[in-house]
Amino acid sequence: HPLVHRYWHDANVAVQDFTNEGVVVSGSWPFQVNTLVANKQPIASVVPDEGATGWADTTMLATNAKHPNCAYKWMEWSLNAKVQGDVAAWFGSVPAVPAACKGNALLTDTGCATNGFDNFDKIHFWRTPEAACSTGTCVPYSRWATDYVAVMGGR
């Protein structure tokens, strides 16, 4: 269909699609919205009444890490409010440490609200596909991955 462009898989490509390819509506992250606003593009965003999908990244430590003390120090550093605020400002995310929402020069005191802090209850978090689930409607990861590639390819 001529109004269907593509399913984006790269946030910067999505920004370019809005800027240069005539895309006028899409699902996105705050990163794209903030980038388009910074580039003076006519853009706005909304979380629908039904909610939106999203995710929370994690940092994991391998059980047999060669230098676990170093890894723990990095994890501790990454949870610092300044670091969390800076990353949230750059990526358009909400920090894992709520204290990062205030007093960060990059994020500003309105950054968490801009990036959706108050919409947390409207987010339906992504889950890893499961082959077996209580509803019997789940698909294995391999099928999900194949279908995802097909969607990205427009099939």
Predicted features along the sequence, with ranges:
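Extracytoplasmic/periplasmic, Sec-exported soluble proteins
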Residues: 6-10, 53, 62-67, 136, ...
